[in-house]
Amino acid sequence: MSIPHSVFSALLVFVALATTTLASTEACLPTNKREDGMNINFYEYTIGDQTTYLEPEYMGYEYSNTKKLGSVSGQTNLSIYYSPPCESTPTCVTYAVLKRDEDGYDPCGPLYETKKRDTEYCDPNTAYWSSDLFGFYTTPTNVTVEMTGYLIWSMGNRRR
């Protein structure tokens, strides 16, 4: 009686594992048509906060409880490089835009409050407006970026 019981137990464990494996792979299948590039959402983040991003809950889901600033889609170049450009030549492009204009178009227009980007003004606790993050006009110094999509690895002319 112990052998049939062992066989039954082993079979039960196998079926349970197979069911769990099938359920976990089915849950991750895409539901929409495939599109090139990633979708990127931007959420508020407190400027100067150097601890919240270390919390697993924040990185896992809590960031989405903050204000969503906007989104872009179809992004295929996912490199992020940003640093406040600090120059001493007083031209339009060397001024940090500190206030976003409602029409969001002319960064050197009269509706902006600007501050010269000299070394003394390159404070990490100052929000500099820029469109350096995937063309989205925001403050790269205090924003959380969420990227979603599927990566199809390309090798030459073949996709894997």
UniProtKB/Swiss-Prot annotation:
Lineage of source species: Eukaryota, Fungi, Dikarya, Ascomycota, Saccharomycotina
Keyword line: Cell membrane, Membrane, Signal, Transmembrane, Transmembrane helix
Cytoplasmic face residues: 24-132
Entries under Gene3D superfamilies matching the protein: 2.60.120.1560
Protein name per its UniProtKB record: Uncharacterized membrane protein YFL051C
Family affiliation: To yeast protein FLO1.
This protein's GO CC annotations: cell periphery; plasma membrane
Transmembrane segments: 133-155
Positions in the Extracellular compartment: 156-160
Residues annotated as signal peptide: 1-23
Compartments, as annotated in UniProt: Cell membrane
Topology class, membrane: Single-pass membrane protein
